[in-house]
Regions:
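Short polybasic amphipathic segments
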Residues: 10-22, 119-121, 400-402, 423
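C-terminal outer-membrane/trafficking sorting elements
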Residues: 388-438
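Internal "kinase-insert"/substrate-recognition segments embedded within catalytic cores
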Residues: 57-63, 71-86, 109-114, 126-228, ...
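A conserved helix-loop-beta module that forms one wall/lid of the active-site cleft
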Residues: 90-124, 408
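Middle-to-C-terminal accessory/interaction subdomains
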Residues: 2-5, 43-45, 49, 90, ...
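Conserved NTP-binding catalytic cores of kinases and kinase-like/nucleotidyltransferase enzymes
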Residues: 1-96, 100
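Extracellular/periplasmic catalytic domains that process cell-envelope and extracellular macromolecules
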Residues: 6-9, 30-32, 46-50, 70-73, ...
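Structural recognition of the beta-strand scaffold that forms the well-ordered cores
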Residues: 53-57, 75-81, 95, 103, ...
Length: 438
């Protein structure tokens, strides 16, 4: 790449990935629509950090995580900085909170959480440190599989003004927020389609703010699991953090035409609030935007949603601590040696980063997780008395997903064809088990 990388414009280039000296991916030189890749700084506040995050857009779809199936191929990827500043963590940083949060989402039964792996990054022959190579929120067979013509993916975004007109506002949305497009039929340039999505969102919001029967408008399964995830992470960030919503098919049946919550994302400020209070995602209140809300403050005024939240929490509560401990044990086994070696190299350019070992970080995360889940138990008991209202069914048909220890979904690969190792199988009721392939 011959030009400086900025957060305004893409820079074209070539991307090569190697593993133990072998080339596992080569985009070749950039030819628009044919080969190569484009690269730019991504993020809002994180774009000002020393280890800047990057957005990658390939000319040709590929699976940069090398899972072997064409359904994983995409043009859209990201490199997230290894250093995650968080004053609640040892030495003021966490390098594992993103993987931890994504694993929590999978164990809660969220339909898709981005897969990722750690990589060492070199740009124009200059070492730039450890990064997390991760799937981004986009339409895809193994991402958010929305209909090409009648589905959409949007983000409730405080930085809507930076999207070159690719956004809309709804009637109940705060004036400083906007919905930006992650996937919009016609790439957001067809005003008829955008108006259809806006009208759909206004109908959903009217139902929520009017305290109507919810199950005809929103998917209680994803809405409850998304907020439980943030409650268990004690998220200390609200506005400006990523809140994704999607509809698989606005013209579809009663399962696929409801509004759904997307994956857990932007987890930097986890465990950065007192454990005795609800997280900011739960309340959507911050002092300098006292009127700021997403849907959850209104939803928790509706007995039907309160009961749905409690029902979901009761389903996941018996297993979730063991599931997250299994994840931490697996990450320690997988990454301890290789990441410690890379961390030493990382510190040659960022001497104050990567100070904590993998076992130290997983132990700290599990300590926080156990204390937080006990606090949420108490908050539910104090704030959510029984309403006597039926939540309606919020279960999914029984199915299983299988993940390797990096979070890659390997469900489509026959178990007999998988490499030897440890895998996590998650059923749609939230239960998981660890299996060994010898």
């Amino acid at each position: 790449m011959g030009n400086a990388i900025t957060n305004n414009d893409f820079v074209a280039g070539r991307m090569v990935m190697t593993l133990k000296g072998d080339t596992v991916y080569d985009s070749q030189d950039y030819i628009e629509g044919v080969s190569g890749m484009r690269f730019k700084i991504r993020g809002n506040s994180s774009a000002s950090f020393c280890g800047k995050p990057y957005k990658i857009k390939l000319s040709k779809k590929a699976d940069l995580l090398c899972r072997g199936g064409k359904e994983y191929k995409s043009k859209h990827w990201a490199l997230l900085a290894y250093f995650v500043g968080n004053p609640s963590m040892p030495n003021g940083e966490s390098n594992l909170i993103t993987l931890f949060g994504h694993a929590l989402g999978r164990n809660l039964g969220i339909s898709w959480q981005p897969a990722a792996t750690f990589v060492n990054v070199v740009i124009n022959d200059e070492y730039r440190g450890i990064y997390l190579l991760v799937e981004t929120v986009n339409r895809g067979e193994k991402r958010l599989n929305v209909d090409e013509y009648n589905g959409f993916i949007i983000e409730n975004d405080v930085c809507w003004w930076n999207e070159n007109g690719m956004y809309f506002h709804t009637n109940h949305q705060m004036p400083h927020m906007g919905y930006t497009y992650k996937y919009m039929p016609g790439d957001g340039e067809d005003s008829i389609v955008v108006d259809k999505v806006r009208n759909y969102m206004n109908q959903v919001e009217d139902a929520i703010f009017g305290k109507k029967e919810l199950s005809s408008y929103i998917d209680l399964y994803t809405f409850t699991r998304w907020i439980i995830g943030h409650d268990l992470l004690a998220t200390g960030d609200a506005l400006g953090s990523n809140t994704f919503l999607y509809c698989e098919n606005m013209n579809g049946d009663s399962v696929h035409n409801k509004l759904k919550m997307g994956p857990l994302w932007d987890l930097d400020y986890s465990y950065n609030i007192p454990f005795t209070v609800w997280g900011l995602k739960h309340t959507y209140y911050i002092p300098y935007y006292p009127e700021a809300e997403f849907y959850y403050p209104k939803l928790f005024e509706i007995p039907q949603f309160v009961e749905a939240y409690k029902e979901t929490y009761a389903q996941i509560r018996p297993h979730i601590v063991d599931q997250m401990q299994h994840f931490c044990d697996s990450i320690t086994e997988l990454y301890s040696q290789t990441l410690e070696e890379s961390a030493a190299l990382h510190r040659t350019i960022y001497p104050n980063e990567a100070q904590n070992t993998i076992p130290e970080q997983t132990a700290d995360l599990m300590d926080k997780f156990r204390r937080r889940i006990a606090a949420v138990d108490s908050l539910i008991a104090a704030d959510m008395p029984s309403t006597g209202i039926s939540a309606t069914t919020i279960t999914r048909p029984q199915s299983h997903s299988r993940f390797d220890l990096t979070g890659r979904n390997v469900s489509t690969i026959p178990f007999t064809q998988l490499p030897a190792g440890v895998y996590i199988e998650t059923s749609s009721d939230g239960t998981t088990r660890k299996v060994m392939k010898r």
